[in-house]
Structure formats: structure tokens, C-alpha cells
């Protein structure tokens, strides 16, 4: 929820803090550079850009955070490879639309994509649309926020 972001499905399901990338990305990226990484794949959390997934305006704090991550990668000569959706549909979209069961999600997704493409177009060359989209069949809620009655 930091940086004025919304709630993700994973936030509610996690039982621990993990690596706390939000506060330690500079050290993490420096370690990656020390190990010789030339590319760093990471995800942009949709709800950090549009807290509810369907907000009128993007969250500038979230946009600035990812810009700082991208700039840190570039500082060390690493190519950022950005995943647009990595099992992190905003929870408000699940409640309002039923996630991807509703075609209304397409407009929300396209708005999110346009926002990040326009913001980072001079800094990011490689984009992945969905992480492991096939996982929707095995884990519909975790992969896409889809609940079945």
C-alpha cells in the first residue's frame, strides 16, 4: 500500500514481508550489477499506478518509483525487461468487475498500458504483457483475480 498504491491480491495472501524491494531496490540492483547481470526483469504493480485499477488519473508516486527503478538499472548498464501484469490484478477490479470475466477490464488494462508505455517509452525497450498467462487455468484467482462461484 506504500506510495499511495492500491491493494493487490498477493498483498492479502502473503504471510511475510519477503525482500522488501520497495525500500531496498537500490541495494538489490547494485548486487545484480556486481553479479554481472545485463538485464533485469521486474513487474510494475498495476495498483501502484492505478490504485483501484480504474482511477481517472495515475498515481504519480507509483510512476516515480518505477522510473527510479528503471534509472537505477540503466545506471548499472542493465536493460530493464518489464512485465505489465504478474499475478497482480487490483483488488478493486475484482470486486467491481469480477476481474477478467468482464470486458470492462480491457479498457482499464489498456489505460494502464498506455500510461506506462508513454511514461517509460524512452527508457524501456522490452515488455511482457502477462506473466505465465497459462497459469489462469490452474490458479485462476492468483493468476488473474478470477473467482468462480
Protein language model annotation of sequence segments:
Residues 1-9, 33-34, 52-54, 63-149:
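Active-site region of glycoside hydrolase catalytic domains
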Residues 19, 57-60:
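Residue-level marker of alpha-helix boundaries and capping positions
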Residues 14, 39, 43, 47, ...:
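Generic serine detector
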Residues 20, 24-45, 79:
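Catalytic domains of carbohydrate-active enzymes, especially glycoside hydrolases
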Residues 39-46, 50-51, 59-69:
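General structural concept
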Residues 22, 53-56:
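Short, flexible active-site loop motifs that bind/organize anionic cofactors or intermediates
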Residues 1-30:
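Aromatic- and Gly/Pro-rich amphipathic surface segment
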Amino acid at each position: 500500500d506504500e506510495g499511495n498504491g492500491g491493494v493487490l491480491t498477493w498483498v492479502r495472501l502473503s504471510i511475510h514481508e519477503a525482500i522488501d524491494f520497495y525500500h531496498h531496490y537500490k541495494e538489490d540492483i547494485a548486487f545484480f550489477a556486481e553479479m554481472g547481470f545485463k538485464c533485469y526483469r521486474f513487474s510494475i504493480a498495476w495498483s501502484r499506478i492505478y490504485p483501484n485499477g480504474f482511477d481517472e488519473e495515475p498515481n504519480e508516486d507509483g510512476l516515480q518509483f518505477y522510473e527510479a527503478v528503471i534509472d537505477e538499472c540503466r545506471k548499472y548498464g542493465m536493460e530493464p525487461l518489464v512485465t505489465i501484469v504478474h499475478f497482480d490484478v487490483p483488488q478493486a477490479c475484482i470486486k467491481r468487475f469480477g476481474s477478467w470475466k468482464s470486458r470492462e477490464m480491457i479498457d482499464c488494462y489498456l489505460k494502464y498500458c498506455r500510461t506506462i508505455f508513454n511514461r517509460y517509452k524512452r527508457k524501456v525497450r522490452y515488455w511482457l504483457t502477462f506473466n505465465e498467462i497459462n497459469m489462469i487455468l490452474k490458479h485462476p484467482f492468483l493468476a488473474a483475480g478470477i473467482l468462480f462461484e
